[in-house]
Amino acid sequence: MSMGNKNKWWKNAVVYQIYPKSFQDSDGDGIGDIPGIISRLDYLKKLGIDAIWLSPVYRSPQDDNGYDISDYQDIEPMFGTMEDMEQLFAEAKKRGIRIMMDLVLNHTSDEHRWFLEAKKSKDNPYHDYYVWRDGEEGIYPNDMNSVFGGPAWKWVPELGQYYFHQFSVKQPDLNWENPKVRRELYDMILWWMEKGAGGFRLDVIDQIAKEPDLKITNNGPKLHEFLRELSRETFQKGDMITVGEAWGATPEIAKKYSNPDGSEFSMVFQFEHIMLDQEEGKEKWDTIPLNLVKLKKCLAKWQNTLYQTGWNSLFMNNHDLPRIVSRWGNDGKYRKESATMLATMLHGMQGTPYIYQGEELGMTNVQFDSIEEYEDIETLNMYKERLEKGYQPEEIMHSIYARSRDNARTPMQWSGEKNGGFTTGEPWFAVNPNYTRINAKEALEDENSVFYYYQKLIRLRKENPVFVNGKFELLLPEDERIFAYTRTDEHTKMLVCTNFTDEEVSCPLLDEWKAGEVWIRNYEDDREGNILRPYEAVIIAFTGK
């Protein structure tokens, strides 16, 4: 039985996210799969990561990239078999790597056995597994909309009822008020723990306690009661790493999710920092330049509020976000420098860092010539909507280049060979044409690559407890070009200093710290003086205090 979150293994762990469809194909069908992941475990071991967060591989009609699950206890055939999954657990374990499953507990697919039963009659034992309201066709129970657009209610004529769906019409919401539903989900989680799962990422977990009659979707009144029961019945029975996805979380709410007593989760994914380059009140496609002062204040707030009262997850990339080197860095002349600078800024903070596949290579956004080359449903819908509203095609494509989820979903770039070494067949989605320059084979042959810089950062975190325990203090809060902070524990004081621009910047802090030991720097030569070169990053430490 787990007793709280103090000194847990995951506090100095680094997690690597895999989007299986785009990682490595093993059988030439153009789709990444589980045997492909197994074949790349040695690469991940070399990087130094401790856990893999695996995007969903359960059986699914793939209406929403596998987040619409039709069987929690089976594997989607395009990814492999249950035997493959068991082999992945075993091979990862041999290398000291845990597998975090991606769990959706808010809804299932409408093709799940429970829902097929639930639709048969109001008396069916599975009917109350979902959220139903009586009504008349065309007169919705209320005016709530789904996240993906359109009403959140779907009429089922044979029952004379509507079911509630916060997401796609093919993703009916589960009824967490029903103890039988909760028990089924807990038993399923325990089954995966028995199989070898080392942790879970919980998709849209802040929406399970919805109360549609009151139009409450996230952070419903019973949310934390449900989460404590979930944790008690499942995660606390093993040494799990757990992270809840909560778009609307504030630091105060995150304290509950990641309470050091271990009653809910290890940590939470919050997205406040990721929204800072989006026009307020507009859509994600409406971008504005990143204001560094705002980014610093936002991250400092999370660092300071959760210090000793919760735990942060540190990330800039995932399967839904554009590539960070293109977003906040410079993916041309200073690609290596800005990729490593951003990594330094993030990994120096308190929390568990997440690396998204290809981030460790400095993979960039993609710019396909025509909308026909894109796959992501959100992107295709936006293109159509904005054309109808009178936007120019070039203007829309510019937004897609900056923001499309497809930027994260182009296949992993393993080598300069055809299709980047991802597949011997026809890839499900085109590889970014820059794979001939940016790929893992090149990176592994260049000791100054982004890959080896990430490897060094990960090693530093493992060797120096100040990364885990040190108190955070933001320096130069109003500086629009430099992001600098210290971390301090009883033995070490560490300075993280980064230049967010493509120009040289003088930084007087470097004079004050010149007697310290340089732990890592993203330029090959050490240089005296207080000038930071374009996108330069350095960590300096005084130890023995």
Positions of PLM-derived features:
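Active-site and adjacent substrate-binding regions of carbohydrate-active enzymes
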Residues: 2-545
